[in-house]
């Protein structure tokens, strides 16, 4: 996120905190103060510095993990140094999911040819990642024929009845691509396959569920994947939460990298009958302790009314959590810091009337 975003949000939040009432207009002084905060935000590197400290200095921070504990300590220190008051934590006891070892292999499958069957393709080890909350496979893994679908909608078009679905007894693979969009809207359209695909596949008798990673890396020149080396560099599987229905027997769920999904799609297009083997060893319901981190810019005569701004402090385990949601943490913290510093310099009558409360939330990813 840009510092322009930080400046705009700082201005909006400041005006809300200083506002006289729901229908009140803003005085020239209020508008000038908001504009000055926006100017300071655009000239400041505080958000970038905070993001670097969190994403690079701490890195992955799943709820309850050592990285999460370091992030909680860092956040308290950062908010205090930014000038926020009443910095505190809120303890949360929870049970978390933990990733274990995972592996997947696409096994060679014969295809119809001019003279019977063409030779089988060579087996291919896939870059994969278990979806968050996925159950484990049996100790020796799961192997079955692949039932390929271009989208979740295509799977949903089949009856939720194993006897009437080709998913029955197979590993369902959803090959839904994420469309590139400046506003990230392609992610929203594709993520439903990750959230709902495993339970819908299970309703139809599937023994496991896989999907193309929700993301746009790999497979296109824009992503730096025009060469084999570029494609290999993009062989990264994207994780994220999935969910089960207690009324449906859960099945293992995983994602493969975009280039690996391209290989699966190409072999399907050539008419190959594919077999896939997958093995995962995950843990669920592991007791853990984490914390929300809270800080405030106190109000004056309307201090009991609160303007709440927040982001989530935790991240998944396979990356640094820079965008999700390190950028959010950095932006709201830096914006609140600007307001705290402005309030400290201002006379009492010019301070925000309402309390501005920052909450850096715990366990969003798996909560």
Regions found by a protein language model. Give the residues of each.
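Acidic, glycine-rich active-site loops and adjacent beta-strand->loop/helix elements
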Residues: 177-179, 215-216, 313-315, 359-366
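Soluble metallo-hydrolase cores and metallopeptidase-like ectodomains found primarily
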Residues: 31-33, 107-110, 128-160, 164, ...
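N-terminal capping segment at the start of a domain
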Residues: 25-65, 222, 250-253, 314-315
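Noncatalytic luminal/extracellular "stalk/propeptide" segments of secretory-pathway proteins
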Residues: 24-26, 30, 52, 56-183
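Extracellular/luminal Protease-associated
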Residues: 65, 124-245, 250, 320, ...
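Short helix-loop-beta-strand segments that form the rim/entrance of peptidase-like active sites
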Residues: 49, 337-367
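Boundary at the C-terminal end of the N-terminal hydrophobic targeting segment
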Residues: 14-19
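N-terminal export leaders
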Residues: 1-3
């Amino acid at each position: 996120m840009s510092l322009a975003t930080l400046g705009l949000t700082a201005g909006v939040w400041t005006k809300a905190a200083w506002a006289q009432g729901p229908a009140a207009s803003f005085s020239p002084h209020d508008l000038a103060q908001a504009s000055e905060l926006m100017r300071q935000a655009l000239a400041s590197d505080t958000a970038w510095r905070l993001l670097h400290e969190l994403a690079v200095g701490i890195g992955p921070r799943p709820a309850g993990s050592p990285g999460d504990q370091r992030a909680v300590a860092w956040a308290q220190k950062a908010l205090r140094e930014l000038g926020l008051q009443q910095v505190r934590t809120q303890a949360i006891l929870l049970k978390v999911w933990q990733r274990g070892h995972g592996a997947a292999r696409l096994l060679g499958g014969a295809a119809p040819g001019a003279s019977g069957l063409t030779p089988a393709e060579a087996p291919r080890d896939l870059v994969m990642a278990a979806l968050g909350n996925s159950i484990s496979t049996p100790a020796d893994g799961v192997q079955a024929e692949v039932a390929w679908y271009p989208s979740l909608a295509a799977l949903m078009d089949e009856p939720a009845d194993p006897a009437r679905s080709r998913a029955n007894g197979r590993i369902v693979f959803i090959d839904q691509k994420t469309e590139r969009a400046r506003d990230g809207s392609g992610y929203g359209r594709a993520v439903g396959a990750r959230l709902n695909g495993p339970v819908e596949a299970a309703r139809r008798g599937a023994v496991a569920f896989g999907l193309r990673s929700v993301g746009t890396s790999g497979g296109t020149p824009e992503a730096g994947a025009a060469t084999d080396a570029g494609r290999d560099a993009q062989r990264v599987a994207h994780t994220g939460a999935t969910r089960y229905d207690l009324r449906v027997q859960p099945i293992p769920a995983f994602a493969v990298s975009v280039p690996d999904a391209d290989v699966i799609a190409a072999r399907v297009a050539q008419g190959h009958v594919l077999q896939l083997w997958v093995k995962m060893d995950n843990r669920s319901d592991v007791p853990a302790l984490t914390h929300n981190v809270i800080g405030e810019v106190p109000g004056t005569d309307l201090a009991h009314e609160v303007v709440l701004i927040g982001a989530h402090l935790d991240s998944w385990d396979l990356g640094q959590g820079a965008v999700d949601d390190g950028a959010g943490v950095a932006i709201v913290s830096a914006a609140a810091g600007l307001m705290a510093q402005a309030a400290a310099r201002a006379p009492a009558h010019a301070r925000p009337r309402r309390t501005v409360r920052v909450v850096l939330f715990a366990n969003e990813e798996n909560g």
